[in-house]
Amino acid sequence: MAKVCQVTGKKPMVGNNVSHANNKTKRRFLPNLQNRRFWVESENRWISLRLTNAGLRVIDKNGIDAVLSDLRARGEI
């Protein structure tokens, strides 16, 4: 399963580990993904989403129905 937020689209980033001696080695910065279930009152069922903490804040701000309609318009669900 891809490490991508279904709401915000955040993906892993690539960067460097930097030691005290300034040696650099490649690393990945992973998004803070959480599996969450949301009760959708209009559909009378649970929806499972894999999203980041930022995605949770978007749902808190806009509501689950608005976010789901946006996801369906993009073809995510």
From Swiss-Prot:
<dbReference type="InterPro" id="IPR037147">
    <property type="entry name" value="Ribosomal_bL28_sf"/>
</dbReference>
<dbReference type="GO" id="GO:0006412">
    <property type="term" value="P:translation"/>
</dbReference>
<dbReference type="GO" id="GO:0003735">
    <property type="term" value="F:structural constituent of ribosome"/>
</dbReference>
<dbReference type="InterPro" id="IPR026569">
    <property type="entry name" value="Ribosomal_bL28"/>
</dbReference>
<keyword id="KW-0689">Ribosomal protein</keyword>
<dbReference type="Pfam" id="PF00830">
    <property type="entry name" value="Ribosomal_L28"/>
</dbReference>
<dbReference type="InterPro" id="IPR034704">
    <property type="entry name" value="Ribosomal_bL28/bL31-like_sf"/>
</dbReference>
<keyword id="KW-0687">Ribonucleoprotein</keyword>
<protein>
    <recommendedName>
        <fullName>Large ribosomal subunit protein bL28</fullName>
    </recommendedName>
</protein>
<comment type="similarity">
    <text>Belongs to the bacterial ribosomal protein bL28 family.</text>
</comment>
<dbReference type="InterPro" id="IPR001383">
    <property type="entry name" value="Ribosomal_bL28_bact-type"/>
</dbReference>
<dbReference type="GO" id="GO:0022625">
    <property type="term" value="C:cytosolic large ribosomal subunit"/>
</dbReference>
